[in-house]
Amino acid sequence: MKSKKKIFSVFAGLLVWGIASSCGAAAYYATIEQPSSASELIKSGTEFNVKPIDFAAISPKDLGYNSAEEWKTDSKPVPQAFADAFPVLLKEANIDNKKVKIISPDERVSKGIVVDVAVKSIILKWNAFAAQPDEFLCNVTFADAATSQKLFSAIINVNSRSGNPYAQAWGMSFSNRLQQAAYNIAWVLTKIIAQGKIDPAVY
């Protein structure tokens, strides 16, 4: 999707940030469904095998693409952005006793916990003036690698809001918003890895 680039002044960008922040724009996700209690096996787990984000349910035409090739071009940087997020997030959270490894979609592992994220729909809501992000409805699953026992399953609405409020107001391309959403999804997974669940409220 070829987004129209809008040029804003620094003042305008910061003004949008201020207005959006006052309206609660710091939310990066909302939980739709999850278990009532935390998974102790996830909390005590030390090895997490994370599969790339699954976009198989997404139709490029529904997002305004004229061809699958355009979608592939825009989404190509997403796997790397997703993988690169975990070392940063683990360090920020001071988590040094857990290892996160990115595995291929069909890779079979016998140790640790396998993490799957499938994006079921993308709701295009991005508005530069209001700093409103797109939304990614995700099915998140954690399973024991050895037994395939499901340890955690949730439906979480993760958005493409940037941690840099000025970048949010500046006018990101859809490819950049996809990468930002991937980072936010990794952030949600990091919280589950640490807590065995995710905070239920909009965060």
Question: Where are these predicted regions, by residue range?
Answer:
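Generic short beta-strand segments
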Residues: 52-58, 118-124, 157-158
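Mid-chain, structured segments of secreted extracytoplasmic proteins
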Residues: 76-105
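Bacterial N-terminal signal peptides that target proteins for export
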Residues: 2-11
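Surface-exposed short loop/turn segments
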Residues: 25-29, 101-151, 161-164, 168, ...
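C-terminal/domain-edge helix-coil "capping" segments
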Residues: 24-43, 95-97, 150-203
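Second-shell loop/turn segments in exported
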Residues: 67-77, 127-128, 168-176
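A structural "domain/chain start" motif
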Residues: 23-84, 194-203
